[in-house]
Amino acid sequence: MSDQKKMTYKDAGVDIDAGNRFVQLIKPLVKATSRPEVLTDIGGFGGLFSLHADKYKKPTLVASTDGVGTKLKLAFMMDKHDTVGIDLVAMCVNDIVVQGAEPLFFLDYMATGKLTPEKAQDVVKGISEGCIQAGCALIGGETAEMPGFYGEGEYDLAGFTVGIVDNTSIIDGSGITVGDRLIGLASSGLHSNGYSLARKVLFEHLGLNADSKVEELDLSVGEELLKPTRIYVKTILNLLRDFQIKGMAHITGGGLVENVPRMMPKNCQAIIHKDSWPKPPIFELLRKAGNIEEEEMYRTLNYGIGMVLVVPETEAEEIMVRLSGLKEDAFIIGEIAKSAEEGEPTVTLI
């Protein structure tokens, strides 16, 4: 027994030294996201953030957590890991800005079978870039090395964000009325939803791979599918300084049909004009190649619209001018009407 080799944590598959090296690699990336309210550097037990609540009459915190889903499979296939972090931040911060909240800080969780510091650093590069785009600070995270739990080279991600809004400025859709206009902000592509369907159509049905080129797309299939989710925070906060936005919907899983009603009061319907915005080529490729019914496209994918705003009819054109000045591709895609029958809000596509 005394001659038995002494075991270490590294022998069991957990490399503490690799974890320490990873922390050193990401310190500049974390620092690049800092805000004046951040009180701690990376490496502490918790991230400290000094809330300047005196700027608000009734400060209200808004929180959200999310992941990237099977889009990660594309990152594994292409061995490209520096953009999925943007997706992670986007999925969280876009969900809180729809209530009028400014994102304050972000935390991430990464779990993998074997930690490769340089690969994990690439992931954090994306998270850092996403936080910069959203104006929030990356104040902490967890990187879990879990031998035998994930396939070789694979990992999973989760994110968490907290934002703030004055209680009197919370956007909940309750003020939406008949005649209000719907403005759609263009997506960059699939964003972070519909990847199980996309992989089935493109890789299984068509027999393509990540490096395949098809005439419908300017990029390879993998590059198109890995386009980062758009972060709408700064655009929306800019609008809120000067205009009334009555409701917003982040168009994720469930598409326009399922997400738009989430912001609407009862007895209303959103009339959406299907020909009011151009459909990006990736969606038409999926629809035709997969023989997917149009209705399924609208209730599964964002179909080219990543965010929907409900605004007063009297302000719609001026808001469109502002959006153009912000280099935002935006379209008036519909209006609010009274429901034909009393009950839950609905979407009508015409």
From Swiss-Prot:
Leading EC class: ligase
EC nos: 6.3.3.1
GO CC annotation: cytosol
Reaction catalysis annotation: 2-formamido-N(1)-(5-O-phospho-beta-D-ribosyl)acetamidine + ATP = 5-amino-1-(5-phospho-beta-D-ribosyl)imidazole + ADP + phosphate + H(+)
Residues annotated as transmembrane: none
GO molecular function: ATP binding; phosphoribosylamine-glycine ligase activity; phosphoribosylformylglycinamidine cyclo-ligase activity
Keyword hit for Nucleotide-binding: yes
Keywords from the UniProt entry: ATP-binding, Cytoplasm, Ligase, Nucleotide-binding, Purine biosynthesis
Domain of life: Bacteria
Subcellular location field: Cytoplasm
GO biological process, one term: 'de novo' IMP biosynthetic process
Matching CDD domains: PurM
Pfam families referenced in this protein's UniProt entry, alphabetically: AIRS, AIRS_C
Disulfide bond entries: none
Pathway field: Purine metabolism; IMP biosynthesis via de novo pathway; 5-amino-1-(5-phospho-D-ribosyl)imidazole from N(2)-formyl-N(1)-(5-phospho-D-ribosyl)glycinamide: step 2/2
Keyword Transmembrane recorded: no
HAMAP family to which the protein is assigned, alphabetical: AIRS (MF_00741)
NCBIfam families: purM
Family: Belongs to the AIR synthase family.
Protein name in the entry: Phosphoribosylformylglycinamidine cyclo-ligase
Organism: Syntrophotalea carbinolica (strain DSM 2380 / NBRC 103641 / GraBd1)
